[in-house]
Amino acid sequence: IKLPIVILTLDKINELRSKGINVSLKSKITLSPLDQEMSLTQKDSITSFQNLIADIFLVSDNSASNVLIDFVGYNHFNTKMNQAGFNKTYLNHKFSPDPYYTIDWEIKTMLNDRISSNEDRDIVTADDNTLGLKKGEKKFKDGIVEFGSLDFSQKNRSSIMDMHNIIKRIIFPSKFDDDNAFNLNVEDYDFLRYWMSRFTYEDLGNKFTTDKKYFESYNKFFIHGVDTVVTNKNIRVYNKIGQAYGTSVDNAYIRNYQDDVEFFLTATIYTNKNNIINDNVYEYDETAIPFLAKLSQSLYNNLKD
């Protein structure tokens, strides 16, 4: 879901520019907490859309994603995705640690133009077969394991085909007749492809290279998996991963420019041996990520041979 959030951020920046508002990816923006009590302890923050988006692609940063949600808006996101033909992709809440109680930001340009959505949270839930979707036999809540499944009908979601088709439009936008689905220009597509394909050691300010948590191939489930060092730097993985509640997904365009191997791959796997939702015991490193790595490696080797 974070990839379309980024796409619609670029889309909205272009919309604002067409209305005469001086804002771009590199523009400095000011974030002010809307909660009055929180504003007493949380100072205004100055950043840029470029930095926020880089953090999302490099380490799947939740806080950066939440800021962009305030910028784009829930209903605007859902309406635009539906208009673009991606009606199985739906945004309903922010990201952890607590998606319903994260900071809401007012976003302004350095010229003091207010550009955040800050719409009300009365979001209409899509009426489709995902309603009533439940997972698990137990759930972890407030430090206690409770019997009963967790209802996912109000969670963020996207179908595997939506994800697959979205990334194809980003990699090869000229191949689609309906390229007006998103209001993006050539520079926007170049920007997306650049950051989708970066490793952590290629980040803007090298802030992730000094943290051992963010190893070289962090956020690259395909090809690299749990390997911490990038052994073949000729292979570029243009991707966005997702991971929550036992589900791991990678959505990618994989290319080796030297050997002329390229393919799209979108795959998801659910690992939750104890059937407890929200306990953070999901066999990601043991099962999920190695599976995704081996799947992509097998396809890559077959195409190479």
Please place each PLM-identified region on the residue numbering.
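Solvent-exposed, acidic/flexible segments
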Residues: 1-6, 22, 42-50, 57-62, ...
